[in-house]
From Swiss-Prot:
GO annotation (BP), single: tRNA pseudouridine synthesis
Signal peptide range: none
GO cellular component: cytosol
Pfam families associated with the record: TruD (PF01142)
Family designation: Belongs to the pseudouridine synthase TruD family.
Encoding gene (name): truD
Residue ranges annotated for the TRUD domain, each copy included: 165-305
Name the UniProt record assigns to this protein: tRNA pseudouridine synthase D
Xref: SUPFAM superfamilies: Pseudouridine synthase
Active-site positions on this chain: 86 (nucleophile)
GO MF annotation terms: RNA binding; tRNA pseudouridine(13) synthase activity
Length: 385
């Protein structure tokens, strides 16, 4: 792990797609942006807990939890939830509370409704809901000021993304209003900042982990772009360019034969020996030994590469892949580490153009942890969603 990380302060999310930007207007408002949680399982119908299906508008999940805990007279940590939902949206998500709070909940319904919170269903369940206990999320997005020409581009690009997938960056929501939460997380990891609120401290550290993941993913896509853009005898010089410092160590291992082998891969994210792959959409991690075999399985959506959310107790990549990944690992992070899909696919994609209103309505499903705004950036070829 690199003891002296480069200053990855201004990370631009890089996308491998070559289509021209598509002009339209998207407003992250509760009317034009709707998120619905796809549960991992159905309520059991009995037990000591209650599973609540909740609709919230204009509230973050943390704000929702604070309002609910205050209304019920319980601690925030007593409320279970599967994932965080965007504040600037209408969100439907599941929460859990202990069954002993049912009477308080029913009394609090009018107050909750005044706070833009509506409890849609209440069902007995046999355990508390935990983080990650969801299959994914379904999304609705309404794009505005869409010309007929751009609507045609949207339809064709949706077909491209359905086939190719897109990079699984963390979205802007992960990094706060000013986009600098990760800097506080870095300071906490370096023992330069201490917060009394453990939950906020952990969230800031996770923002720093996410920042390093995004920086690594951008670097890997830069590698793929170089391999696509240059002739075999020009690739090495490009990799050694001052513009790509995180690829210099990798360049030292490159041979003409390796470059030709990597250029033969057809998918937009190039697989390297030593990459940690994972069966898709869920399954076990394993080390890539044969890039020819695994890149074919990647094209078929059977597996996908993963990137590090560095910390303790995680598996780092090997060989060539580690030459790049090592530069984005910080050994000072003491939070648990893990691997995250670097590449994902949207499912059940539907696009409908309404010419009289110049609106384009999008429906799609994403795996848990993936951001609709990143899918939209891939679709529109922009970096501002």
């Amino acid at each position: 792990m690199s003891p002296h990380l480069p200053q990855f302060t201004n990370i631009s999310r890089i996308y491998p797609f070559t289509h021209t930007p598509i002009e339209c207007y998207f407003n992250t408002s509760p009317r034009d942006f709707v998120i619905k949680e796809i549960p991992l399982y159905e309520p059991s119908g009995s037990g000591e807990h209650l599973l609540l299906y909740v609709r919230k508008k204009g509230l973050s999940t943390f704000e929702l939890l604070n309002i609910l805990s205050s209304s019920l007279g319980c601690r925030v940590r007593d409320i279970g939830y599967a994932g965080l939902k965007d504040k600037a949206a209408t969100s439907y998500q599941y929460l859990s509370i202990h069954r002993s709070l049912q009477n308080r909940l029913e009394s609090a319904l009018p107050h909750l409704h005044s706070q833009h919170i509506k409890i849609l269903t209440i069902t007995p369940h046999n355990h508390k809901l935990k983080i990650g206990h969801l299959k994914g999320n379904s999304f609705f997005m309404r794009l505005k000021k869409v010309s007929s020409n751009n609507a045609t581009k949207l339809h064709s690009t949706l077909e491209l993304l359905a086939h190719s997938g897109f990079p699984n960056y963390f979205g802007n929501q992960r990094f706060g209003k000013e986009g600098d939460n990760f800097q506080s997380g870095k300071a906490i990891s370096e023992h330069k900042l201490t917060l009394k609120n453990k939950k906020i401290s952990n969230f800031l550290i996770s923002s720093y982990q996410s920042h390093l993941f995004n920086a690594w993913l951008s670097s890997r896509i830069q590698l793929a772009q170089i391999l696509r853009s240059f002739k075999p005898n020009e690739v090495l010089r490009a990799l050694q360019s001052p513009n790509f410092p995180t690829l210099h160590t990798f360049a030292k291992s490159c041979t003409p034969q390796l470059i030709k082998t990597l250029q033969s891969q057809k998918q937009p994210f190039v697989i390297l020996q030593g990459d940690i792959m994972c069966h898709y959409p869920f399954g076990k991690n394993f080390v890539c030994d044969d890039t020819l075999i695994e890149s074919t399985r990647f094209l078929q959506k059977d597996i996908a590469p993963t990137g590090a959310l560095c910390g303790t107790k995680f598996t780092h990549s090997k060989c060539l892949a580690y030459d790049i990944e090592e530069q984005f690992l910080d050994s000072q992070i003491k939070a648990n580490g893990t691997r995250r899909y670097a590449w994902v696919w949207a499912e059940n994609i539907e696009g409908r153009y309404i010419p009289q209103e110049a609106h384009f309505e999008l429906h799609f499903h994403l795996p848990k942890g993936s951001y609709a705004t990143i899918f939209l950036e891939s679709l529109l070829s922009t970096h501002n969603c």
